[in-house]
Amino acid sequence: MKIMNKKIDVTGIGCAAWDLIGTVKNYPMPGDKSPMKNFEEHPGGQVATALTAVSRMGGHAAIIEICGDDYYGDMIRKNLSHEGIDINYLIKDPGKTSLLSFCACIEDTGERAIFFTGGSKKSLEPEDIPSDLIMSSKAILMDNYHGKASVYAASLAEKSGIPVVTDIERNKLCNDELFQKGTHHIVPVQYLLEYTGEKDPETALKAMWNMYHSELIVATMGDRGSIAWDGRNFICQNAYRVDVTDTTGAGDVFHGTFAFGLTLGYDVPVNLKFASLVAGLKCRNYGGQKGIPYAGELKNLWKF
């Protein structure tokens, strides 16, 4: 299918959240306390953060998701709209609460632990997926938060030859179907090893590719960069080096930037470099989205 006449670059299906972020010297032991040196509120969620990266890189993004009608739901909607993301299919669930996360960041390393509640809002169902939006998109990005709805959306995209990038990092019943129907799987290395039962990234990538014969499988490895397998070759990419403040959202930014790179026609080595650059720059600031650069900031680092 030709994609140049489509209106949306990347449509995302999955988490939009509100993040509460505290910085600590170290994590307390059970029963102990640790003072926070900094506390901030930021927009978050896997897909919402990924789409923010798409929008800031100059792409046209849309989200399919459900929020509550609470304070945090209002903040999520306002932020996505402010970022230029199409929220026509961001459903409000009356009387329900939204997805909320608390991120505890280690001051010296930027590493973080995340605690979250999904809220009382309902999940997306297949009937909530607008087929016209899927068909109007150059690429689809999804996590596994909404299960059946995401599988349905992936099926629509698969039938029309639209690339589907998955962001899956924990077990759910829908994972096998999403891996079958998706085209590009970007997986944290620890989950990749767990999912395949292998001991090293290279063997795990091959094992997963043999299961699904996807166009590409990428293992993200934090400050060790990423490695991909396309069924013939390994492609390696170093992490982009910055002074790290907070790694929250870096993987989500990698996913979003990579999905946008597909719509720009980038080959795998170029796209991995693009995603690594933008994800690395994100880590300069607290929060999943605050540090995401705008395209203009990349003028001396990247040529679109």
Question: Where are the language model's segments positioned?
Answer:
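Glycine-rich phosphate/adenosyl-contacting loop at the front of the ribokinase-like
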Residues: 1-66, 71-78, 82
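Conserved phosphate-binding/catalytic region of the ribokinase-like
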Residues: 2-8, 35, 201-304
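Beta-strand->loop->alpha-helix junctions that form or flank phosphate-binding loops
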Residues: 38, 64-69, 88-98, 169, ...
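Gly/Ala-rich phosphate-binding loop of Rossmann-like dinucleotide-binding domains
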Residues: 55, 158, 263
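Conserved phosphate-binding/catalytic loop of the ribokinase/pfkB sugar-kinase fold
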Residues: 88-93, 103-139, 144
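Active-site glycine-rich loop that binds ribose-phosphate moieties when present
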Residues: 121-130, 148, 166-173
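Conserved phosphate/ATP/ADP-binding segment of small-molecule kinases
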Residues: 154-236
